[in-house]
């Protein structure tokens, strides 16, 4: 069943998954958490809040219990998740001290307005 989030009673949801952009999380996730729903947020909105754990279950499951501070769990960026899952066993064996990473993200990830500007950066004399 699909329901309008504006009318949704989060007290009826054990877990609420947010992945509709930071503005939606900003507006509705705190309400869901206050109503007793455990919020798992896949946007960037809560990633840097000290009281909200940033969780990759395969990497730091011991941090999950800290969601009780705000009833919210944040996820890292998708590139970060894949990387840390792969690096965790190496780190456990060899204690990685530093890593430099470059990622290349899709323009569409920043929204439809950014996509309209791709013609400014793409080569015009060859196929893409």
Predicted regions and their residues:
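N-terminal Rossmann-like NAD(P) cofactor-binding subdomain of oxidoreductases
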Residues: 1-120
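Single conserved hydrophobic/aromatic residue that forms the stacking wall/gate
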Residues: 119-128
